[in-house]
Amino acid sequence: MPLAESRGGASGGVWGNAPTVFRALNSKKATNKGAGSEASLPVTSRSRRSAPKLLYPLLAYCRAEWARPDSRKGDILIMRQTRTVSLDTLEYLYIPDVTYATYGETQRKMQLIIPYRPQWQDGETVPLIVFLPGSAWYRQEMYNGIPALAKLAERGFAVASVQYRESKIAPFPAQVEDVHRAIHHIAEQLAKLFHIDMARTFLMGNSSGGHIALLTALRQAAGIADVSELLNFPIRGVIAESAPSDLFLCAKEGVPANMPATFHPTADLLGVSCPQEHPEKLAEASAQTYLAPGHAVPPILLLHGDSDAQVNVAHSRTLYERLTQNGADADYIELAGVNHGGAPFWTEDVLQIIADFIHKHC
């Protein structure tokens, strides 16, 4: 008889969200098999795959702890206790490497982390966060951040972590074009399937990803159609963490001392050897360029550590001042003693600030 049922929870489990049922054999079979034998505790799942080796110790533990009865009545095991548990967070699905655009032999992909319910209510949808990883505009690492992004999915937000073309492949504004193509792909292919409300789309990014999130929203607010053949979906808000917003300041300060001598992110993003000689390109890739009274700038949340050694905190301080001067809805959170990115931006306090910002503007 079934002893317990487990669905892949917030950690994704060994099989993600495929329902998994642990069963103990009847008492005779359980007695005949050794305590550590996986054969005495078979597993069935929706896909009917065999249990991964990583699960064997768990199965043995379940058999030892769950199948310990207070009394026996034939083959029926009577449990010692019954407990009621409640979940404060949603389960989620992780769908890796979804291709949204192809440029010759180059594919751009996204990672999807989607809230999961066994049964959705009619018309129930979730907001979308399009997340852009930081990478100094070079090739992004797309997998290490999944556990952190899953915390947002647990709070009820669909997350699409979007890989955009690195500067070595294409200079700015190719990265902004990729964001539009990713949003369009989600709207056309995925939104209905995963209960995503495209009218509640937010952009989020850290470091260079935050820069691309800002530029995508601000260029759209200024009436610039970066991908003319695609319909622009409304952007309800932007969350930018440790983001460079003033490329003139980047060019002036040069490469951080802890970076290799061959590291020239600003020059590579603009596709030039000396950024200072191309002020028009620096302006095109700077957020402040697109701020003007009357522009329909979406709400913006800026977060920055005051001890950032890679992206000067002046970027966010100055941008916040310019946003408020132009009548934009902007919030700025400065994290005391925090360097560039990392774990401080994924604490429960910061996640709650982000969640409150999204709920406020949904």
PLM regions with names:
Residues 1-24, 30-38, 43-69, 74:
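Short, low-complexity intrinsically disordered segments enriched in small and basic residues
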Residues 16, 72-362:
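Alpha/beta-hydrolase superfamily serine-hydrolase fold, recognizing
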